[in-house]
Amino acid sequence: MNSEYEDAYVHKFYSKYAKKFDVTRYKTWPKISSFLKVYDKPGFLNLDAGCGNGRNLPRTGGVWIGLDYSKELLNCIVDKYCKVNDQKDLDCGTLSKKNICKSELKYSLVHKSSSTPHVSFNLIRGDCLCLPFNSNTFDIILSIAVIHHFSTPERRTQALQEMHRVLKPTGRILLYVWNEETKFQSKFKQIKNKDYLVRFKTFDRYYYLYDHKELVDACVKNGFNVEESGIEQESIFVILKKQI
């Protein structure tokens, strides 16, 4: 496998089907809600790394930044939370002024407004393999169904290492990947070993399917303690903290 699979079977998929995919992803899973209820606090700075259509973004508590590679999915977020009469509330700026970014970085800021009083977060188009933030920046990181889209062991490792780098020593990560046990469903087509294509409409998406031990071992190898793990929504989740 190589990164060309991601271009052909991940990026092109989300570019073509962003709006159709958006309407299928609208609920926050129970474990995500309970995790944030415990760990998210006012004054925290948090990252949704691979935020997709933003279903986990509108929250009380800390300040949230949503990062995704797909500009089409980011536009879905803007379309949902910035109504026509609230377009003035969509602004641009540079997060380097907030002393969290490594360089000048443009972003979109969705403010609270009359039609979306509960919404206030930043949106950035970026790559989870090279997060554009300073080290030890975030109190919470969400990585929900993201790293299984990276098509080589090296790239999946790099994604874990980048989250480790930008997480504060006291921070937590909630990470989900699809469970290998789902491979028996008819929508899965094996390429080889644990590499699969999954049909949505008329287009295939690429996934690497983890088993529980493999995910836990990968997290520990890359500098994390696994505080909790389990299964939810056909996925494996882990709650991570940096090893001391």
From Swiss-Prot:
EC number: 2.1.1.-
Protein's UniProt name: Putative methyltransferase NCER_101265
GO biological-process terms attached to the record: tRNA methylation; tRNA wobble uridine modification
Ranges in coiled-coil conformation: none
InterPro entries in UniProt: AlkB_tRNA_MeTrf/Diox (IPR051422), Methyltransf_11 (IPR013216), SAM-dependent_MTases_sf (IPR029063)
GO molecular function terms noted in the UniProt entry: S-adenosylmethionine-dependent methyltransferase activity; tRNA (5-carboxymethyluridine(34)-5-O)-methyltransferase activity; tRNA binding
Top-level taxon: Eukaryota
Keyword check for Ribonucleoprotein: no
GO cellular component: cytoplasm; nucleus
CDD domains xrefs: AdoMet_MTases
Broad enzyme group: transferase
This protein's UniProt keywords: Methyltransferase, Transferase
Assigned protein family: Belongs to the methyltransferase superfamily.
